[in-house]
């Protein structure tokens, strides 16, 4: 097996002529550039979530896929688990009648994992994921809950999301994680320990999504 290392190692990988698909499972910020490079070099791509970090990147992926005629698939694994597939099948067969409200979540206490995320050099005390949570507010990992719900509610198959409001708690656990790793006070941890998002669709249906990777509680989505 060949190994390609370094921040730009993926470019050499994508230039190979003996592979058909590039599976992307890096930190979030590298999903987009690796996917674009792969498609530019004639490879299909399968991307772990999130596939893009802003709206422009979403459109760039779409346009590149259409231009190169290469598949660009988002690997939202929660859309394909047994419970979600079974529930989707029941919804599509009318078992629940018209579904007008749905809940989804990503509630996953990451305390056993924070120390294992990739760090950018010896000076990086946080790792990429804790650093991202410190810098960004809101639901930063929405698709585990939102993906299956969107399928069940026929989003982009006759309905669309129209309005959104989100509210979060203050940061207690996140702030303490940074302080423990840096030995200094953290007064600007932006991501609340728990975020709740409400979305209303054009057809009058309501989605509730929750995000919590900080507090100790059972895994739930």
PLM-predicted stretches and their roles:
Residues 13, 22, 102:
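Receiver (REC) domain switch-region micro-motif
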Residues 9-17:
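Short amphipathic alpha-helix with an adjacent loop that forms part of the alpha/beta core around
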Residues 21, 27-28, 32-80, 94:
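Beta-strand-loop-alpha-helix segment that lines the small-molecule cofactor/substrate pocket
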Residues 68-73, 78-189:
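Predominantly a Rossmann-like dinucleotide-binding segment in NAD(P)-dependent oxidoreductases
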Residues 25-26, 210:
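Short, well-ordered coil/turn residues at beta-beta hairpins
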Residues 185-195, 199-221:
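NAD(P)-dinucleotide binding in Rossmann-like oxidoreductases
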Residues 1:
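N-terminal Rossmann-like dinucleotide-binding module
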